[in-house]
């Protein structure tokens, strides 16, 4: 199973990147073929401009992936601008793919913010979402480490379900 994990936050201390790395580790342990893309290393331009080399590479990776996991931070109860640019410019080949969401937010009241990403993926490309979302807040981290055992268990369960369902959808 070829899984693309997109960490979309541009923050130097991105907590959603930590979630992506934790899921990557879990899926690698299950012998999945993982490509992790860190948006911090992807120069981007808006949809009306020519794509950068890195954006063209991401478009190819989306096309080649069997499924996709998207890591996002919350900004004003929605997806961040970098994720929106990457969705608008690089996801045309995502139609019908299975996907999952990892979300890091500053506070507990942002838990519905992932619904905007769900609407985009389901309405634009008819993607199929894993019904489990990993949602974390600042209290789940100590500096740059996931400190919550509950969050680690949710990551493990998300990864197990993503692996099992993703493989079933391939057969």
Residue positions per predicted region:
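A short acidic, often aromatic-flanked loop/helix-cap motif at beta-alpha or helix-coil junctions
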Residues: 42-45, 137-143
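A glycine- and small-aliphatic-rich helix-loop capping segment at beta-alpha/alpha-beta transitions
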Residues: 85-92, 119-124
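N-terminal beta1-alpha1-beta2 submodule of the flavodoxin-like/Rossmannoid cofactor-binding fold
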Residues: 1-90, 147-171
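His-Asp phosphorelay/catalytic-motif detector in bacterial-type signaling
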Residues: 95-96
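Juxtamembrane helix-loop transition sites at the ends of transmembrane segments
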Residues: 87, 119, 140, 144-147
């Amino acid at each position: 199973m070829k899984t693309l994990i997109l960490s979309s936050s541009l923050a130097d201390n991105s907590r959603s990147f930590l979630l992506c790395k934790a899921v990557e580790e879990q899926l690698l342990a299950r012998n999945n073929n993982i490509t992790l893309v860190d948006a911090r290393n992807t120069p981007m331009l808006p949809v009306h401009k020519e794509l950068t080399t890195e954006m063209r590479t991401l478009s190819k990776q989306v096309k080649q992936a069997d499924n996709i996991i998207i890591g996002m931070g919350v900004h004003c109860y929605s997806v961040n601008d970098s994720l929106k640019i990457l969705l608008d410019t690089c996801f045309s080949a995502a139609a019908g793919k299975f996907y999952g969401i990892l979300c890091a937010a500053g506070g507990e009241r942002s838990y519905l913010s992932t619904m905007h990403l769900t609407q985009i993926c389901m309405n634009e490309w008819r993607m199929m979402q894993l019904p489990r979302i990993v949602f974390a807040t600042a209290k789940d981290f100590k500096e740059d480490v996931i400190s919550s055992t509950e969050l680690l268990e949710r990551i493990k369960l998300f990864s197990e379900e993503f692996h099992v369902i993703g493989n079933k959808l391939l057969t």
